[in-house]
Amino acid sequence: MNIIKLSLFLSFFTFILSGQTSLNQISNDISNNALLIYETDKDEAILLSRQALVADPSNAYAWAVAGNILRKNQEFKKAENFFKKSLEFNPLLKEGLYWSAENNISLDQLDEANQKLKILINSCSGCNESVMLKLSLDKKKAQTNSNDVSTKDN
């Protein structure tokens, strides 16, 4: 009798886990579609990114994508909340770190962006995200230095 109960429990548990995995995959697919259509239909991309969060509210990638779409839409403050949620679920998600740091740069929060760069370098030193973020930070620093020099000249 105990073996039957254990078998039923394990079967049910396996069923639940397989359902969660498929919801996660659906959420990822919806998020990827949102990124793909952003340039042609911003409103639809925003709706899709929200649907991805409904499909799996604990999907760090979906939160990062939703934040990135807001960032691209220049809604930096709103985007920040989505990136925070993404990094709560997965503090090493390279897309979450990269897009969040780009958002920090847009908000002139260079210390936060540099912290995320350090995490990216430690977790995926050769990945595209760490290289692109380093370039973005260098560009922002050059702009800041150039502005400082032109201000001093006046």
Predicted regions and their residues:
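Register position in tetratricopeptide repeats
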Residues: 39, 72-73, 106-107, 136-143
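Canonical positions in the second alpha-helix
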Residues: 51-52, 85-86, 119-120
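Structural marker of alpha-solenoid helical repeat scaffolds
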Residues: 55, 89, 122-123
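Canonical tetratricopeptide repeat
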Residues: 65, 99, 133-136
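Terminal, low-structured helical/coil segments at or just beyond the last alpha-helical repeat
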Residues: 114-154
